From Swiss-Prot:
NCBIfam families the record matches: aspS_bact, PRK00476.1
Keyword Zinc: no
Pfam families (alphabetical): GAD, tRNA-synt_2, tRNA_anti-codon
Subcellular compartments: Cytoplasm
InterPro entries: Aa-tRNA-synt_II, aa-tRNA-synth_II, aa-tRNA-synth_II/BPL/LPL, Asp-tRNA-ligase_1, Asp-tRNA-ligase_1_N, Asp/Asn-tRNA-synth_IIb, AspRS_core, GAD-like_sf
Matching CDD domains: AspRS_core, EcAspRS_like_N
Biological process annotations from GO: aspartyl-tRNA aminoacylation
PANTHER family hit by this protein: ASPARTATE--TRNA LIGASE, MITOCHONDRIAL, ASPARTYL/LYSYL-TRNA SYNTHETASE
Name of this protein: Aspartate--tRNA(Asp/Asn) ligase
Length: 629
């Protein structure tokens, strides 16, 4: 075995304690005696010398072993491999002028080794771990996650974890300075599913009953306000059993905030202050506050989404009136049925060739899911207008009217989709993002100015066709606008909520609302949602009871900490900013969770598996089950 053949290299660490990290030393440290400890990043044999790049969390230092300084250390250094753990005693000296590395903070110096101790050896890692980006291979993510302890040695991942730590500390200091109390809420709570599924925890002491891991501390933080604690904050783990994607994890962290007697303006001001503090501390950037605001309806109709990316200017336009009386049956039937024709002006793309337009049409139908794309090209030579419909089907004058309404000029392209709200606006919004990325208008996550936006005035409820009833747009504790209370029973989807989302570069990073603090209003909302009095008392009786005892007005916000770090780091995925994340299938390859448990454990919990026919437990579990029976 590799380990046994190299075991004789390992020695006791007889060196003094580490004097410096591998990122500390500079030219002014010339001549200083130092002790460094870390991992071998690379080893090079050159001109009778051994060069080792020694790495730790703080940086990289070049160490030079010479037979003239210490023959034994030189010979051992020649046997070092990547990821061996060593301790080096030596002296700082300047590098030769031709050897200076200006890209490395320690690149002006090297350490001439006087002694070497190998603290542990490493087998050949399954992938390259290196501070040198060019040596980092495109490794399969599942392999990296299966050996996350190695992956965590990569400097870019360590920088993300450090950034996360600094965000934690800045957040704690900010809320402490604003007189907030940090209160821990229970992790084992009652199951009150709303939207996503709960993760359930069976109770051994109460067979047949279950705790749930919190999807958020929503009800608890409201109860803290009823309890008079006035200002609450918690950086808290939350859990949702839902389908995953790049920006979702089954367990995630949020900055949870609640205040009594709060108005929307106070929540905005507090949150903007936190963002300004974070950007100043972590990015050395001054944010302009207050952030711009946009209603939900305006965001949907202008950008096709409730989380618009304002870093580029393409906007949607409702051009339904331009096609009135056109005789084009597709447009006429949709508009007559209350639908919309939505246009997107794309500057400078009026000369696109037929093949490029065919690919765009395919993308609209295959990827975006729209019924079709009607487009109008205004060639840059000013020759008129071209469209992908015959003039018999749709006379050119209607396309020209739409182009004029959206401000198109010679050389521009006008794209139109037809359908019903909100779907057609969402499809047009997806087309906007596609064009922004294809044309390089949308900056990468780690480039360009950040664009914050408050989206306000959400509907309190939306109609769920599958459920056949209204459902909460946010959650059932969101306060309706007082002017709309009389519409709650008759037309709940037209009731405006006192809710708001914070958006950054097209990502929702937080959401909150002013809460219902009146028992009667809360019961009325439950009733509209199809939750009768008995079910409401069973699921939320503790909160309903609390609202009877002088509950103060209150409101707050929850900010996604993982997503904030991801955007600050310019990372592609939440998995790049969490130490031990789950995969997109909800698994953790390193510890192999979720895993089967012994039948005895299930029996203790009064549980029995009823598996689908195509799922069988592994042999080790099946064998134990037979023995137990």
């Amino acid at each position: 075995m590799e380990r046994s053949s190299r075991a004789d290299l390992i020695s006791e660490d007889s060196h003094p304690a580490r004097t410096h990290t591998c990122g500390d030393l500079r030219a002014e440290d010339n001549g200083e005696a130092v002790v460094l400890k870390g991992w071998v990043d690379t080893r090079r044999d050159h001109g009778g010398l051994v060069f080792v790049d020694l790495r730790d969390r703080y940086g990289l230092t070049q160490v030079v072993f010479s037979p003239q300084d210490n023959q034994t250390a030189y010979e051992v250094a020649g046997q070092l491999r990547r990821e061996d753990v060593i301790s080096v005693q030596g002296t700082v000296r300047p590098r030769g002028e031709e050897a200076v590395n200006p890209d490395l903070p320690t690149g002006a110096i090297e350490v001439s080794a006087d002694d070497l101790a190998v603290l542990n050896t490493s087998e050949t890692p399954p992938f390259v771990v290196s501070a040198h980006e060019e040596r980092q291979m495109n490794t399969n993510e599942d392999l990296r996650l299966a050996h996350r302890y190695l992956d965590l040695r990569r400097p870019d991942l360590q920088e993300n974890i450090e950034l996360r730590h600094r965000l934690y500390q800045t957040t704690h200091r900010y809320f402490d300075a604003h007189d907030f109390l940090e209160v821990e809420t229970p992790v084992l709570m009652k199951s009150t599913p709303e939207g996503a599924r709960d993760f359930l925890v069976p109770s051994r002491l109460h067979p047949g009953r279950f705790y749930a891991l919190p999807q958020s501390p929503q009800t608890y933080k409201q109860l803290l306000m009823v309890g008079g604690l006035d200002r609450y904050v918690q950086i808290v783990k939350c859990f949702r059993d839902e389908d995953l994607r790049a920006d979702r994890q089954p367990e995630f962290t949020q900055i949870d905030v609640e205040m009594t007697f709060a108005t929307e303006e106070q929540v905005y001001e507090l949150t903007e202050g936190l963002m300004a503090d974070l950007w100043d501390t972590l990015e050395d950037t001054t944010l302009e506050t207050p952030f711009p605001r946009m209603t939900y309806d305006e965001a949907l109709r202008t950008y096709g989404t409730d989380k618009p990316d304002l870093r580029f200017d393409l906007e949607l336009h409702d051009v339904s009136d331009c096609f009135a009386g056109s005789g084009f049956r597709v447009f006429d039937s949709i508009v007559d049925d209350g639908g919309h024709i939505v246009a997107l002006r794309v500057p400078g793309e009026g000369d696109r060739g037929r093949a490029a337009m065919d690919r765009l049409e395919d993308h609209v139908t295959d990827e975006i899911g729209a019924a079709g794309l009607i487009y109008f090209q205004l060639p840059s030579d000013g020759s008129g207008i071209e469209q992908n419909l015959s003039s018999d089907a749709l006379p050119h004058e209607y396309g020209r009217a739409a182009a004029e309404q959206v401000g198109a000029e010679a050389g521009d392209l006008v794209l139109t989709l037809a359908g019903h709200s909100p779907t057609v606006f969402e499809q047009a919004g997806a087309l906007r993002l596609h064009m922004g990325e294809e044309l390089g208008l949308r900056p990468p996550a780690d480039e360009g100015d950040d664009a914050f936006l408050w989206v306000t005035d959400f509907p309190l409820m939306e109609y769920d066709e599958e459920a056949g009833r209204p459902v909460s747009m946010h959650h059932p504790f969101t306060a309706p606008h007082p002017d709309d209370l009389d519409r709650l029973d008759e037309d709940p989807t037209q009731v405006q909520a006192r809710a708001y989302d914070l958006v950054l570069n097209g990502n929702e990073i937080g959401g909150g609302s002013i809460r219902i603090h009146n028992h009667e209003t809360q019961m009325q909302v439950f009733d509209v949602l199809g939750i009768d009095e008995e079910e409401a008392q069973d699921r939320f009786g503790f909160l309903l009871d609390a609202l009877r005892y002088g509950a103060p007005p209150h409101g707050g916000i929850a900010l996604g900490l993982d997503r904030l770090v991801m955007l600050l780091a310019g990372a592609d995925s939440l998995r790049d900013v969490i130490a031990f994340p789950k995969t997109q299938s909800g698994k953790e390859p390193m510890v192999k969770s979720p895993d089967w448990v012994d039948p005895e454990q299930l029996e203790t919990l009064a549980l029995r598996l009823d598996l689908p026919p195509d799922v069988e437990p592994p042999a080790r579990i099946a064998q134990r089950k037979r023995l137990a029976s």
